[in-house]
């Protein structure tokens, strides 16, 4: 559960920090994905693509670290 303190009735700042926390925890993405039924076959393909993207990103980060 996400907690956001509201100091001195500053609701605008609290809303901004809530949005940032929700984006970091991928709440918006999970809400979007659960809007419609996703068949298991499509879910497997999506998860595999996400995994490949994550691994590609990690490899690129390692290469950059080795070059420096």
From Swiss-Prot:
One of its GO terms (cellular component) is ribosome. Belongs to the bacterial ribosomal protein bS21 family. One of its GO terms (molecular function) is structural constituent of ribosome. InterPro entries: Ribosomal_bS21, Ribosomal_bS21_sf. It comes from Orientia tsutsugamushi (strain Boryong) (Rickettsia tsutsugamushi). Pfam families: Ribosomal_S21. NCBIfam families: S21p. Residues 39-68 are annotated as: Disordered. This is Small ribosomal subunit protein bS21. Keywords: Ribonucleoprotein, Ribosomal protein. GO terms for biological process: translation. Residues 54-68 have a biased composition (Basic residues). It comes from the Bacteria.
